[in-house]
Design a protein with these regions (language model features):
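Glycine-rich phosphate-binding loops of nucleotide-dependent enzymes
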Residues: 1-213
Length: 213
């Protein structure tokens, strides 16, 4: 049967209300969806429009006030887009190119730029390398590591690519059938990961008569 779910999520002591997306984004949480074409990007809009979209809509950035009137700060938008295009190596003709015409890897980089433009404290990234080429995978993963180590940003990656997770993560949580089974280090044996992905905590397997190497 169904059970009532309860609990709360706090970020730096502030409780987050996930029924109010705007308040969560304003609190410093950003997400890069695995469905970049469905929900991650506005495919018929330019790269620069995509990058600043959330920051403009949620935080009111990239707008200039003239008395009772508000005007888009096109110069600042262009400068911001060019900075991200350079830092993330987005291969394009320029900031005005439509996002729908980019390769999968470059679309993913635009999604990351869009999230970073919100200056988040906490970044969720779902399947960051799905559907992109090897070179783009390397750059995307290196970018996520740099955000954590150089900017102190907390980055949570959800991925089915275990070896990729091992190469960039400090610790890896294994979830099976909706439940947290274990949290392992990247150096843990593959056998432990195999057990955890089957829903068995490695330490419990040993207690029940399994072998330890």
């Amino acid at each position: 049967g169904l059970y009532d779910a309860e609990g709360k999520v706090e970020l730096f002591g502030q409780e987050l209300n996930f029924k109010d997306t705007r308040s969560v984004l304003s609190a410093g949480v950003a997400m890069v969806s695995e469905d970049r074409k469905g929900v991650g990007l506005l495919l018929d809009r330019s790269i620069e429009d995509n990058i600043v979209f959330n920051a403009m809509q949620i935080k009111g950035e990239y707008l200039k006030k003239f008395g009772p009137f508000t005007q888009i700060d096109s110069k600042k938008i262009r400068e911001t887009a060019e900075e991200y295009i350079k830092s993330l190596d987005i291969r394009c003709f320029g900031p005005t190119q439509h996002s729908g015409t980019l390769s999968g890897g470059n679309q993913q980089k635009v999604c990351i730029a869009k999230a970073l433009c919100m200056s988040p404290k906490f970044l969720f990234v779902s399947e960051p390398t799905r559907g992109i080429d090897i070179g783009a995978k390397k750059l995307v993963l290196e970018t996520l590591v740099r955000l954590n180590r150089e900017l102190g940003m907390t980055v949570v990656i959800v991925s089915s690519e275990l070896q990729e997770l091992k190469s960039v993560s400090d610790r890896i949580a294994i979830v099976s059938e909706g439940k947290l089974v274990d949290i392992l280090s990247p150096q843990a044996p593959d056998a432990d990961y195999g057990l955890a992905m089957s829903g068995i905590k490695p330490s419990e397997h040993i207690e029940k008569g399994g072998t330890e190497e």
